[in-house]
Structure formats: C-alpha cells, structure tokens
Amino acid sequence: PTFSTSKDGKIWSEPKILIQEAGREAKTIRPYLKVVSDGKSSIHFTFTNGHPRNEPLNSVYYMKYENGKFFTANGKQIGLMENLPVSHANSDIVYNGKLTGIRAWVWDIALDEDGNPVIAYTRLPSETDHRYAYARWTGKFWLDVEITPGGRWFPETPDGKNEFESHYSGGISLVQSDPSSVYLSRMVDGQFEIEKWTTVDNGASWSFLSITKKSTQLNARPVSPRGYNGKNDYVLWMTGNYIHYTNYQTKIKMHLQQ
C-alpha cells in the first residue's frame, strides 16, 4: 500500500510505501488494506500479508496514525512519517494465521463510541468454508471471535471450470455508526442472502435479522455507507448474476433499517 499527500488537492507529493514486510519487497506481494478515520486527527489501518491465494498463513494486522507518528492499539509508537514503511512485525497482530494454520482476509474497520477500532474479516479454513470473524480492541487487548460460517466463494463458477477467485466471500460490512452490528452475505439453502448480525456483549453471542430471503439470484457484497448519522441505518448490496469481475449482470439494491 502506498499513499500521497496534498495541501490543496492540486499538487501531490511523491508516493510513499506505507507498510512492508522486511525481506518481502517484491512488487507481486500486495498487502490488502482497510482504513477508517475519526475525522479529526487519527487514521486507523487494518491489513494483511498479501492476497490469500498467495499467502496460506495470511494474518490480520492493525496500526494507527496520528500527528506524524504510527502506533499500536495500546499506544506504543512503531514508526514515523519520515521513516517509512512500517513493518508488519512491529504492528499489532489481530489474527495470527501462523498459529492457526488458517489464512484470513480483511473486510472492514470502524471505530466504536470510545474511539477503539473494530475489525471485520474472514477466516478461510478451505475454499468452500469461509468464516466471518470480528475483532475489537477493548482498551486492554484484542477480543477476536467468529460470527458465523458464510459458505463458499460467491462467484457462480461455470460447470466444468475451476474457480479462480475461490477466496471471494459473500462479504461483510460493519455499521459505522454502531459497529456492534454487521451486514453480511452468507449461503442459506443454496443461495447467498443478506443478513444483519448484532451483538450486545462484544461478540460473545450474536442474533441476526434476514434482509433477503428465498432469493432466486445471489445477494452479495453488502456495504453500510459511512458518514450517515441518522437513527436508521442503510445497507446496499449487489444482486444478479456474477461469474467474474469481468463478467457480470448485476444491480445495486438498498435497504433502510427502521
């Protein structure tokens, strides 16, 4: 991941590499990154070692930027803007694929009412077994739990073909205004459906509400829009036929939770 800065939106700095593993500087290694800001002074990042197709032990990491410095969740300084990139080894390990032997992929990050980070990601025990997971910083440690199994990949693989994007989950999105809830897409009775899952005990238990039911076409990649501060929350998702990111006939639907 790289970034560039500007003070006027017209002139931009030369790009800088933000994070990089020592000894793994090849251009083909690409950590996946999700970002959220408090809109004031801090930017929060969650990221992986790379693409799960290429990283059988893909892990989930976290760091925060504020006032020219980079920190772990407990406030330990791990880098400076003038001394980039930040190393994976110095960042928080939220989920350790080396310990479990199961690869992961990041999906979303949000901040709770105390400004602490909450992360949604998938654990991928196999190509046909995707698990939605939820991690949040309690102020003292990372609480990391599974939400629910999600099924297999969501692209509709043609008969007789092997699926190239077998780690493409149905998708999960945190409700930014209240990240104790997520929207996700999982396989129900042979079809991908959208559901809202909520916890009232920091992930120890979950309840869910079906947004779509008994669908004839897939419903995938839910997104809960950022910046909406109303009492109700929205979710948008893709529905239709999807074979590949170059071959699809889909539309976007929206649901308002009242």
Indicate residue ranges for each PLM-predicted region:
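Extracellular, repeat-based ectodomains that mediate carbohydrate processing or recognition
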Residues: 1-258
